[in-house]
Amino acid sequence: MVVGAFPMAKLFYLGIRQVSKPLANRIKDAARRSEFFKTYICLPPAQLYHWVEMRTKMRIMGFRGTTIKPLNEEAAAELGAELLGEATIFIVGGGCLVLEYWRHQTQQRNKEEEQRAAWNALQDEVGRLALALEALQAQAQAMPSLSALEELREELQEVRGQVCNAHCTSKCQAASSKK
């Protein structure tokens, strides 16, 4: 049984997401304790969230034009801290998704480049083989055909026969009998 490579990147992202929850809880605790954090970071988003939520609920129930009272500071700080914690988890999760997408795109791009390089190498090899084939075909056409060789052999024997008849020497007869 072949075991594939363990996806270390996915394990790393899962670890980051698991660490983000306690991190969000620490941020919430710090937001509750720090006056600056509470006043400038937690309260404005909490009041805005409360206003949008209440306005939406009022419109759904059919009440229009009613004024919405802002949350008291304690409730707004609590809601702001919760929103901040959830935003932290969301941002970490979104960051992990973006990193995973980027990693996948990089792998895909590398794979396509490898395929393109292999394709180009195959095309080069086919071109080289086509040139070699053309050269071999040209050599084959330049060579005399088998029937032409037979004709030349017959002419050679006729010439030998004529030379032998003309000189009638024993050497010529011996030479023609060897062939």
Swiss-Prot record:
Keyword annotations of the record: Coiled coil, Mitochondrion
Record InterPro entries: OPA3-like
Chain segments annotated as coiled-coil in the UniProt record: 120-143
GO biological process: bone development; fat cell differentiation; mitochondrion organization; neuromuscular process; regulation of growth; regulation of lipid metabolic process; visual perception
Domain of life: Eukaryota
Subcellular location: Mitochondrion
One cellular component (GO) term of this entry: mitochondrion
Effect of residue 122 to P: Homozygous mice have their visual function which is severely reduced, consistent with significant loss of retinal ganglion cells and degeneration of axons in the optic nerve
Family membership noted in the UniProt record: Belongs to the OPA3 family.
Job of this protein: May play some role in mitochondrial processes.
Protein name: Optic atrophy 3 protein homolog
Organism of derivation: Mus musculus (Mouse)
